């Protein structure tokens, strides 16, 4: 009886050992894959494809791996001809998030001729639409080149007012640069003047790093001079990311915390191949770069 008991115990122990070994093997196979980096796309990058096949284009953007999108198709309370909630659903159903959109209404020329009743009604509609779409940011993509310092100051005052309205709705107002902002008006650099004369609590700057370089300036110098003002960065190159050698992406990313950057948005305006090839190549460039962190949210 004792022998049978010992034999049974031995069999049970061996079985337990084998079962445990199998479980350990399974656990090794179930180690989660490396977390995906947070990389967003400005949908202007696929502007013609969106016109031809909106749903198919969004699906391809998601398949590449992008975390979310910034819209470039706002008009009269709609995004790409859809109600804000429908636009949001189309992006979220694809597994991405809606971060922001480019929109804006310029002042009259001269600014004193602006119809303020119509202007504020336009902004009320735009702000509500961005809020309903679940966006965090509303970004002004462009202004006419100011002819005088008074024109430039009028835009700074205007953006402070719009930014206050955005804050009240739970949004943040941003301004996206090109290269003309790095010219002077009456002895003042346009970009610097805007940074100095807008309220950081009401207006952030979506720095387009490529256009800064084309304007003869270094993005990191601005991060040092205006820390915390650049909450969203437009990551762009002359063609696909990393091809021109003109943009020091590693230095930009290494100083992202100084900039105050929380989100990085890829924009590809010109391509060597198709737009889809271009946005995939640009995504892969960042996703494979050791200097790019998984997330820049604090």
Where are these regions (language model features)?
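C-terminal motif of bacterial Sec signal peptides marking the signal peptidase cleavage site
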Residues: 18-21
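Acidic-and-aromatic substrate-binding clefts and catalytic sites of carbohydrate-active enzymes
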Residues: 46-52, 71-83, 105-120, 144-153, ...
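Bacterial N-terminal signal peptides that target proteins for export
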Residues: 1-8
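Aromatic-rich peripheral "rim/lid" segments of glycoside hydrolase catalytic domains that contact
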Residues: 255-256, 269-298
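Acidic/histidine-rich catalytic cores of soluble enzymes
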Residues: 68-69, 167-253
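N-terminal pre-domain/capping segments
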Residues: 4, 23-136, 284, 288-298
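Active-site acidic/histidine proton-transfer and metal-coordination neighborhood
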Residues: 109-204, 276, 296-297
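Hydrophobic faces of well-ordered beta-strands that scaffold small-molecule active sites
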Residues: 37-42, 69-71, 98-103, 138-140, ...
């Amino acid at each position: 009886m004792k022998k049978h008991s010992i034999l049974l115990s031995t069999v049970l122990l061996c079985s337990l050992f084998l079962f445990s070994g199998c479980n350990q093997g399974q656990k090794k196979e179930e180690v989660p894959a490396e977390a995906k980096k947070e990389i967003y796309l400005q949908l202007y990058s696929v502007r013609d494809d969106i016109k031809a096949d909106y749903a198919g284009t969004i699906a391809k953007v998601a398949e590449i791996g992008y975390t979310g999108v910034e819209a470039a198709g706002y008009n009269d309370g709609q995004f790409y001809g859809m109600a804000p909630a429908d636009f949001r659903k189309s992006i979220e159903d694809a597994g991405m998030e809606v971060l922001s959109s480019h929109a804006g209404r310029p002042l009259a020329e001269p600014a004193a001729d602006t119809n303020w009743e119509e202007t504020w009604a336009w902004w009320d509609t735009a702000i509500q639409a961005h809020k309903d779409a679940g966006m965090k940011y509303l970004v002004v993509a462009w202004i006419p080149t100011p002819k005088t310092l008074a024109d430039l100051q009028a835009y700074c005052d205007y953006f402070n007012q719009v930014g206050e309205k955005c804050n009240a709705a739970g949004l943040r107002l941003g301004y996206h640069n090109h290269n003309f902002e790095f010219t002077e008006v009456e002895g003042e650099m346009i970009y610097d003047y805007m940074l100095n004369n807008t309220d950081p609590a009401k207006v952030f700057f979506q720095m387009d790093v490529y256009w800064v370089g084309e304007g003869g300036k270094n993005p990191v110098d601005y991060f040092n001079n205006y820390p915390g003002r650049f909450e969203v960065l437009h990551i762009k190159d002359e063609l696909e990311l990393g091809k021109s050698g003109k943009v020091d992406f590693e230095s930009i990313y290494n100083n992202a915390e100084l900039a105050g950057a929380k989100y990085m948005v890829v924009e590809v305006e010109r391509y060597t191949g198709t737009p889809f090839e271009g946005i995939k190549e640009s995504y892969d460039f960042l996703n494979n770069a050791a200097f790019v962190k998984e997330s820049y949210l604090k």
